[in-house]
């Protein structure tokens, strides 16, 4: 059903189009009748309301205005050229940056070139300054020469009796000078060379040391008699007879002058004490060395080998029976002195027959 409807619609539209074409073909010969010639043909744009419905399909073709082809071409070429120049500048800048990164010497070359240009500019300015200075010096020298020459000219041209002013003198000078003929002007005279610089002052003579020489001049000097009334006079003879003493140098004075208490350094420092090594100073008697048994291979000494048995009266339990009051320790005294003191004491205090000295004392004295 829908296909049938679509086909009907298409046929109706086709019939309408055919009828419109027939109507347009009938109307067109009437409209194409020759019109009277116009003086200036002008394109008139008519509105859509004035155009009949049969000619509506011709309206778009009549109203189209084609632009100028040259303007369009110029516009597109300008745009393309701008894009090309921008791309070229970007590529050139990127290439320059890449070259500077790969070859850093190029940066130094550019800096050198800029420095050379600055030096050239400075040289030009210096040359200009020198030329200006030369011109100023030449002008000053010329003016000085003119000032020197003008008074002599005035004296020759103007009589002395007639005083004249500056204006009159100038007119007289101009009248006396012969007017040049109609000749080409002569070139200006060359400027005189600049005056030489003034000579440098001579250096001062070296100061000679004052030496008192014993020459004939001193002999010629007569010693003037001393005036008792006036002040005391010092003669040359007194100066020659003066004897000078050697003075101490600054270093010697510093050595002699004691240093202040704040700057004094300690005589013995901690480092000196740390570097000190003490030596053993034990002197053992020969008798004890003989009795002592020294084992060379062992570091620890066995005290049992150093002790020896002594004949001492012992109790049944084994303790020695010694009279401690009569024993001499020998501290601070030599054995000879202890024996002498003991004899003296015995003579002063005789012992009773019951008391008897133990045998240990004699053995102790013999040991000492």
Swiss-Prot record:
Broad class of the protein's primary localization: cytoplasm
Motif KEN box mapped to chain = 324-326
Keyword Manganese: yes or no?
Answer: no
The UniProt regions of compositional bias labelled Polar residues, in chain numbering, are 166-180
What does this protein do, in the record's words?
Answer: Plays a critical role in cell cycle progression.
Judging by the UniProt lineage, the source's domain of life is Eukaryota
Q: Show the ranges annotated as biased composition (Basic residues).
A: 1-20
Q: Which residues carry this modification: Phosphoserine?
A: 299, 352
Q: Where is the composition biased (Pro residues)?
A: 181-208
Residues found modified as Phosphothreonine: 33, 295, 354
Q: Where in the cell is it found?
A: Cytoplasm
> Which organism does this sequence originate in?
Mus musculus (Mouse)
Q: Where is the composition biased (Low complexity)?
A: 350-368
Q: What positions carry the motif Phosphodegron? A: 293-299, 333-338
- Residue ranges, annotated region (Disordered): 1-41, 166-208, 347-368
Q: Which GO terms describe its cellular component?
A: cytoplasm; nucleus
Name the GO terms of the biological process aspect.
Answer: regulation of cell cycle
Q: State what protein this is by name.
A: Proline-rich protein 11
Q: Motif D-box: list the residue ranges.
A: 304-312
């Amino acid at each position: 059903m829908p296909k049938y409807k679509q086909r009907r619609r298409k046929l109706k539209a086709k019939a309408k189009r055919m009828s419109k074409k027939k109507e347009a073909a009938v109307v067109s010969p009437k409209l194409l009748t020759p019109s009277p010639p116009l003086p200036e043909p002008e394109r008139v744009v008519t509105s859509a309301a004035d155009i009949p419905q049969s000619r509506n399909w011709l309206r778009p073709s009549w109203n189209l205005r084609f632009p100028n082809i040259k303007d369009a071409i110029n516009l597109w070429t300008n745009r393309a050229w701008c894009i090309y120049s921008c791309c070229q500048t970007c590529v050139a800048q990127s290439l320059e940056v890449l070259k500077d990164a790969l070859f850093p010497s190029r940066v130094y070359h550019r800096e050198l070139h800029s420095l050379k240009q600055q030096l050239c500019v400075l040289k030009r300015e210096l040359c200009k300054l020198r030329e200006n200075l030369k011109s100023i010096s030449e002008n000053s020298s010329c003016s000085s020469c003119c000032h020197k020459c003008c008074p002599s000219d005035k004296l020759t041209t103007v009589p002395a009796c007639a005083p004249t002013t500056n204006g009159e003198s100038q007119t007289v000078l101009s009248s006396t000078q012969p007017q040049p003929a109609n000749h080409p002007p002569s070139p200006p005279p060359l400027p005189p060379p600049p005056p030489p610089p003034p000579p440098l002052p001579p250096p001062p003579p070296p100061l000679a040391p004052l030496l008192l020489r014993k020459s004939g001049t001193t002999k010629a000097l007569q010693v003037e008699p001393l005036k008792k009334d006036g002040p005391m006079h010092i003669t040359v003879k007194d100066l020659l007879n003066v004897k000078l003493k050697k003075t101490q140098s600054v270093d010697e004075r510093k050595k002699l002058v004691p240093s202040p208490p704040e700057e004094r350094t300690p005589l013995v420092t901690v480092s000196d004490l740390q570097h000190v090594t003490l030596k053993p100073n034990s002197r053992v008697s020969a008798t004890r060395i003989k009795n002592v048994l020294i084992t060379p291979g062992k570091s620890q000494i066995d005290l049992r080998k150093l002790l020896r048995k002594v004949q001492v009266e012992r109790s049944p339990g084994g303790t020695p029976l010694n009279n401690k009051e009569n024993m001499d320790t020998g501290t601070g005294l030599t054995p000879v002195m202890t024996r002498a003191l003991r004899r003296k004491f015995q003579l002063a205090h005789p012992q009773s027959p019951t008391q008897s000295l133990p045998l240990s004392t004699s053995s102790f004295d013999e040991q000492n």
